[in-house]
Swiss-Prot record:
ATP binds at F45, E46, G47, G48, R49, N50, N51, V52, F53, K65. It is found in: Virion; Host cytoplasm. Belongs to the protein kinase superfamily. Ser/Thr protein kinase family. This is Serine/threonine-protein kinase 1. Transmembrane segments: none annotated. Its main location: virion. The active site is at D152 (proton acceptor). Its EC number is 2.7.11.1. The lineage of its organism: Viruses, Varidnaviria, Bamfordvirae, Nucleocytoviricota, Pokkesviricetes.
Length: 298
């Protein structure tokens, strides 16, 4: 048995893996033109359009993402290649395909969880939530400067290193080219995060939509997952603004979630909002990424 195969089997025995894959996961080989990999047979995540598996290459845990060709084209590969060196964006290591699937081989972030599960059982303190949202704005700004819009910003598409509190954006299956001037009539993201102008009029502009989704992520960081607010709650004028945060925090959320998109905060003004006063405008890397996996492989 090769060392990568041994390492993956060890990972599958950890409590984290037992929870994610169940004890039935086994290890199989998969070859590309460049490398031999080992992959768990049970997915970490099963979605309507893709399945995500844990894998291993020499010295490095990795993620396999299988995207159905019937559901969506291979745009995610094009976008990830264009964003390859963009801070805060998950890295594409390699790409292959078969008759049914686009297969993306993506970096694995140890000690991480998606933001949805990070605040599943707890409400975040304002200081931590504010830093997460500020990181998110900076990352989206970097994506914007490369000429793209993510298209599906939500808790599940953000992963956080639970030790360093650093986030990365994942799942670019809904990403499209940036077009600031023309209305968009197709919604590729998640319905619960849709902006009210699309709900009412059937169109939206990309940057006001982005501001809306950032506001949705922000307001839900202060709630248990089971209490998450979505568009319908806000349209009903439910009291969605967290009580125990600063006035500038309340102002930020209110101005991001303004029903009238013309009165909503502009995307370019987000980074200079008073709520983020004193925070550094830089995206910290997750230290020793791709090198030190001693906390995962035991």
């Amino acid at each position: 048995m090769s060392r990568p195969e041994q390492q993956l089997k060890k990972m599958l025995k950890t409590p984290q893996a037992q929870y994610a894959f169940y004890p039935t996961a086994k290890v199989e080989r998969i070859s590309t033109t460049q490398h031999m990999y080992f992959i768990a047979t049970r997915p970490m995540f099963e979605g309507g359009r893709n399945n995500v598996f844990l894998g291993h290459q020499v010295g490095q845990p990795i993620i396999f993402k299988y995207v159905s060709k019937k559901e969506i084209p291979g745009n995610e590969v094009i976008v990830l290649k264009a964003l390859q060196d963009t801070p805060g964006v998950i890295k594409l290591i390699e790409y292959t395909e078969n008759a049914m699937y686009h297969i993306l081989i993506i970096e694995y972030i140890p000690n991480s969880v998606d933001l949805l599960h990070y605040h599943y059982f707890k409400k975040l303190e304002e200081t931590e939530a504010k830093k997460i949202i500020f990181q998110l704005i900076l990352i989206i700004q970097n994506i914007y400067e490369k000429g793209f819009i993510h298209g599906d910003i939500k808790d599940e598409n953000l992963i956080i290193d639970i030790n360093q509190k650093i986030i990365k954006v994942i799942d670019f299956g809904s990403a499209v080219r940036l077009d600031e001037t023309r209305p968009q009539y197709n919604m590729f993201g998640t319905w619960e995060y849709v902006c009210p102008e699309f709900y009412y009029y059937g169109y939206y502009y990309q940057l006001p939509l982005t501001v809306w989704t950032i506001g949705m992520v922000a307001v839900n960081l202060f709630r248990f997952r089971a209490e998450n607010f979505y568009l319908n709650d806000i349209l009903k004028r439910e009291n969605y603004i967290p009580e125990n945060i600063s006035e500038t925090g309340k102002q930020f959320i209110t101005e991001c979630l303004t029903i009238n998109e013309n009165k909503r905060l502009s995307f370019k003004s987000l980074v200079s909002h008073p709520w983020f006063k004193g925070l550094k405008k830089e995206i910290q890397p997750i230290s020793e990424l791709g090198v030190d996996y001693k906390n995962v492989i035991t």
